Amino acid sequence: MVESQCMLGPAKGKDFDDSIVLGPVIVTRDELDNPYNLRMQARINGETWCDNNSNTIHWKFSDMIAHISKSETLYPGEVIGSGTVGLGCGLEHLRFLNDGDIVELEVEKIGVISNKVIRR
């Protein structure tokens, strides 16, 4: 997969039914002064697992859009997932989610989303 060769991860292999969560708030580009300088945190059951900044991303949003547009048609209003913030993957820390865990993701100037892990 070309995404893996470009350090994009298995991008097209990460989206499954019911796997994408949005909200409670989304913002448009004009609402953020600088999307490349936002504090981002991940907490599991109240414990901080990741505290980083959007300035650690490998690819700018314009680069991601250009890459996706090579093989797919994008329409106004579509949402593009940009991946995991630096050091935000549990595998990097040898820590994994369990059934019942509460995952909170927070992005400065946007808000917090909280979800419970449910094993199917």
Where are these regions (language model features)?
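Catalytic-pocket segment enriched in acidic/His residues
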Residues: 2-120
